[in-house]
């Protein structure tokens, strides 16, 4: 199917600001789905609240637009009741790791077959530019006018430590790599986490004087490197991108079905 066949054109134009990276993430996701040849009826997109969560309204799949931070909880329920469906959960950095942080670590621990896309623009964009758990030390935000003193989570390390069986990172600059990673994540049986570094030129960019959206994307080009590269050895401050974890361990829903079968047999 063509990419346009996967969207609800009646809801366009979208609400995202000019230069926002979320449209690039959506495009990469739809290209991944298209390349996999997936039917619209075998995909469920579950989102919470925030700029990133508007994706569920734009895609012509089964969709749920749920509560702030609870997308993974809703997605867990859908997956347990309809395990044959492919669950994709786009979340913002606050949605996933602030109010939704508890659900995130337990979904990873259980290894539920969901694809969690953490769209990290380092800010709460929809509600006015407050800092998030991924904003980082020293940045400016509406709730940190004299700089933020919190240090950021490392999403990759957090997901890995919590037990996710697929963990990756991409950026809105490296779109071909991002689409490839998303394909791998969707095909993986288990909890997949894909962090996407995506720009918010309106709140994060202006507040921190980072220039235009193109300037911010240029930073992803210059400040990231493939996993294990020589550049990383020479400059430890570079952010690695690629697939960090990909392992096969028992998937939660499959194991749960075994328990149900045992219970019905009475042993």
Predicted segments, located by residue:
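Short coil/turn connectors at secondary-structure junctions
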Residues: 12, 39-43, 81-87, 109-115, ...
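Conserved thiamine diphosphate
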Residues: 3-4, 133-184
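Glycine-rich beta-alpha junction loops
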Residues: 49-51, 121-123, 174, 197-203, ...
């Amino acid at each position: 199917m063509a990419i346009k066949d996967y969207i609800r054109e009646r809801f366009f134009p979208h609400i995202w600001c000019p230069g926002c990276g979320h449209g690039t993430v959506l495009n990469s996701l739809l290209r991944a789905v298209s390349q996999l040849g997936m039917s619209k009826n075998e995909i469920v997109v579950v989102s919470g609240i925030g700029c990133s969560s508007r994706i569920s309204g734009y895609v012509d799949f089964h969709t749920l637009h749920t509560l702030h931070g609870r997308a993974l909880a809703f997605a867990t329920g859908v997956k347990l009741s309809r395990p044959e469906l492919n669950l994709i959960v786009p979340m913002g950095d606050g949605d996933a790791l602030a109010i939704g942080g508890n659900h995130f670590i337990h979904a990873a621990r259980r290894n539920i077959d969901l694809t969690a896309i953490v769209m990290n623009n380092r800010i709460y964009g929809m509600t006015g530019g407050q800092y998030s758990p991924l904003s980082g030390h020293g940045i400016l935000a509406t709730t940190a006018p004299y700089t933020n003193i919190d240090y950021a989570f490392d999403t990759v390390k957090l997901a890995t430590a919590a037990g996710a069986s697929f963990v990756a990172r991409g950026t809105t600059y490296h779109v071909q790599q991002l689409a490839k990673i998303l394909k791998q994540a969707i095909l993986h049986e288990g909890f997949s986490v894909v962090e996407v570094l995506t720009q918010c030129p309106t709140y994060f960019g202006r507040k921190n004087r980072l220039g235009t959206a193109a300037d911010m994307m240029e930073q992803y080009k210059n400040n990231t490197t493939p996993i294990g590269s020589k550049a990383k050895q020479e400059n430890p401050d570079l952010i690695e991108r690629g697939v960090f974890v990909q392992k096969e361990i028992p998937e939660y829903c499959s194991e749960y079905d075994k328990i149900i079968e045992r219970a019905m047999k009475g042993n």
